[in-house]
Curated annotation (Swiss-Prot):
SUPFAM superfamilies: V-type ATPase subunit E-like. It is a peripheral membrane protein. InterPro entries: ATPase_OSCP/d_CS, ATPase_OSCP/dsu. F(1)F(0) ATP synthase produces ATP from ADP in the presence of a proton or sodium gradient. F-type ATPases consist of two structural domains, F(1) containing the extramembraneous catalytic core and F(0) containing the membrane proton channel, linked together by a central stalk and a peripheral stalk. During catalysis, ATP synthesis in the catalytic domain of F(1) is coupled via a rotary mechanism of the central stalk subunits to proton translocation. This protein is part of the stalk that links CF(0) to CF(1). It either transmits conformational changes from CF(0) to CF(1) or is implicated in proton conduction. PANTHER family: ATP SYNTHASE DELTA CHAIN. This is ATP synthase subunit delta. F-type ATPases have 2 components, F(1) - the catalytic core - and F(0) - the membrane proton channel. F(1) has five subunits: alpha(3), beta(3), gamma(1), delta(1), epsilon(1). F(0) has three main subunits: a(1), b(2) and c(10-14). The alpha and beta chains form an alternating ring which encloses part of the gamma chain. F(1) is attached to F(0) by a central stalk formed by the gamma and epsilon chains, while a peripheral stalk is formed by the delta and b chains. Signal peptide: none annotated. It comes from Chloroflexus aurantiacus (strain ATCC 29366 / DSM 635 / J-10-fl).
Length: 157
């Protein structure tokens, strides 16, 4: 009998614990580093901070944003509660896609990336094909991109 493990469900308690710990550490450090430069903040931060929290706090100090730390700490637990950990995806096509095509693309993106919010756009200059953006990844399978690639190869020869 095959079992399916829901990795996201298994990881949820870990993610919740990490976010809670990060929020607590940010809240505790906020008054200590308020108004300090990054080098001054580094000197007063506790050694037992999560490395990511330490780096985040130093970046906030460097950018002069320590006044926003309490708001950031308050927002962290909300990522789990509101489900806002979903990935945003954008699909651009040369023509309007049918409901069936959109459903298939959404399903495939969800299989690959988990919780995905997909928005669809039409850009006739693509000529054909799709451009799919998920987070910072871009898959440009448009006819416009293919023709541009052929043009670059021909110009290089």
């Amino acid at each position: 009998m095959a079992t399916t493990i829901d990795a996201r469900a298994l990881a949820a308690p870990l993610v919740e614990a990490l976010l809670t710990t990060a929020a607590e550490q940010i809240r505790a450090a906020a008054p200590r580093i308020a108004g300090l430069s990054a080098s001054e903040a580094a000197a007063v931060l506790p050694a037992d901070l999560l490395p990511q929290v330490r780096n985040f706090l130093l970046t906030m100090a460097k950018e002069g944003l320590t006044g926003e730390l309490n708001a950031v700490a308050a927002a962290l637990p909300g990522y789990l509660e509101t489900g806002s950990r979903a990935v945003d995806a954008s699909v651009t096509s040369a023509i309007e896609l049918s409901a069936e095509q959109k459903e298939r693309i959404t399903r495939e993106l969800q299989q690959r990336y988990g919780d995905v919010h997909v928005t669809y756009h039409v850009d006739p200059t693509l000529i054909g094909g799709l451009i799919i953006r998920v987070g910072d990844q871009v898959l440009d399978n448009s006819l416009r991109a293919r023709l541009s690639a052929i043009q670059r190869v021909l110009q290089a020869s």
